[in-house]
Regions:
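Extracellular/periplasmic, surface-exposed regions of secreted and cell-surface proteins
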Residues: 1-13, 36-95, 106-397
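Acidic, Ser/Thr-rich peripheral helices and adjacent loops at domain boundaries
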Residues: 12-17, 21
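Intrinsic-disorder/low-complexity loop/linker signature
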Residues: 18, 29-30, 277-278
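Outer-membrane beta-barrel biogenesis signature
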Residues: 26-35, 247
Length: 397
């Protein structure tokens, strides 16, 4: 829980740039608002006067995790993890008539504002693992995973100009006589995942891994919510071969490895497949001879029911080298990543007839592809290892 007040950041800048003339305080010890009339400046300390500028934020935050782990059979392990996060925040702001703070655009002091937000998220993950060995030399590891998460965010804000009761700050917005406006927002997303992984090792020298994920998200349209992402890798620990026995006194590890896998990106969580609208209230009317307060709805984002997952196809070939019982370790990798169906927020052409309020509208689309490849080197050394002193180095290129 936090409860804090924010000072007007322009106080110090104004104090340095204002003319060094006049008195900050009057004879009674009060803030002298127009301390330098010739300079046309108000006192840079005006916001320090009682009820002239208030910016108070109260927040509560909670996070918790719990898990259950069972081993019903030898080699069989089940673990369930549940985590949650809750947060609430209230930010109240008041600008008095003498405030020098940068007031919210479109308003004049006195002005009272309140911003409220609340969010929660939880994630539930279950992992079932079974490790076993056949005929002494064949080791297997099988893992199954399910995961579910949900996130919800909501917010609202209120503005009231003409709140003359400075002593009541932002606690009485109903006293505002002009430009009383409200706004709110809400979003909710959910995701579900299933995963399977198989590990195989023969005598600890020949290694194989295969996995696949099935991920689904709520913010993509039907037919595009789910996709699968397979991966496979192989490894050969050459240093464990019998023909390498003569090198064991200085070569502690030599391993070749290669892998290929697909990863996915579902983009932002703002329902790219569905269109949204915004709203605005004109306190003095929308024009055309109508002076009464008016309310309009306008286009926000344009939904695309065909937008889907962005996919990256990754290839990696590498070698691990360990010398002198692990005192020197070198890893070298060559990688190549092809990313296809890039998610991009594209500006719609004016000729489409689709436009947001005051600007062209944008829509998420899958378009284009990229390629990223290169070589990566990593060197780790244990230079000095003593009982009370250790010096190590790590260099990556």
């Amino acid at each position: 829980y936090t409860d804090g007040n924010t000072r007007n950041q322009s106080v110090f800048v104004n104090a340095l740039t204002f003319l060094p003339l006049g008195d900050v305080y009057d004879a009674g010890g009060n803030i002298n608002y127009e301390y330098c009339k010739d300079g046309g400046k108000v006192n840079p300390m005006a916001d320090e006067a009682k009820d002239q500028y208030v910016n108070n934020t109260r927040s509560t935050y909670f996070t918790g995790n719990a898990y259950l782990e069972l081993t019903p059979l030898k080699g069989l392990t089940f673990k369930s993890v549940l985590g949650t996060t809750l947060s609430n925040s209230r930010n109240g702001v008041f600008f008095g008539k003498k405030s020098i703070a940068n007031i919210t655009s479109g308003y004049q002091a006195p002005l009272a504002e309140i911003y409220n937000s609340a969010s929660y998220a939880y994630r539930w993950e279950n992992v079932l693992t079974y490790n076993f060995t056949l005929a002494k030399d064949h080791s297997f590891g099988v893992t199954g995973i399910t995961s579910y998460s949900k996130n919800q965010d909501e917010a609202n804000e209120s503005h009231a100009q003409g709140q003359e009761l400075a002593g009541q700050s932002f606690h009485n917005l109903s006293a505002g006589t002009e430009k009383v406006q409200v706004a709110s927002s809400f979003s909710q997303t959910q995701s579900m995942s299933y995963a399977f992984r198989l590990n195989y090792s023969y005598k600890g020298k020949y290694l194989f891994t295969f996995s696949n994920r099935w991920d689904g998200v709520s913010h993509l349209a039907a037919g595009h919510k789910w996709d699968s992402f397979p991966a496979a890798a192989i490894g050969w620990r050459i240093s464990d071969e019998t023909f390498m026995e003569k090198t064991q006194n200085w070569l502690s590890n030599l391993k070749l490895r290669a892998g290929y896998g697909v990863t996915g990106n579902s983009g932002r969580k703002d329902a790219a497949y569905s269109s949204t609208t915004g709203s605005y209230t004109y306190p003095s009317g929308v024009g055309f001879g109508n002076s009464a307060a008016g309310h309009i709805q306008y286009g926000g984002t344009y939904g695309n029911p065909d937008v889907g997952w962005e996919k990256s196809y990754n290839t990696n070939i590498g070698i691990d080298l360990g010398l002198f019982n692990g005192r020197i370790n070198l890893a070298a990798d060559w990688y190549n990543t092809d990313t296809k169906d890039l998610l991009y927020s594209r500006t719609m052409p004016i000729t489409s007839g689709i436009a947001a309020w005051g600007s062209p509208m944008k829509a998420w689309q899958n378009l284009g592809e990229t390629n990223n490849k290169g070589i990566e080197l990593s060197l780790n050394t244990q230079n000095i290892v003593k009982k009370n002193f250790t010096w190590s180095s790590n260099i990556t290129f």
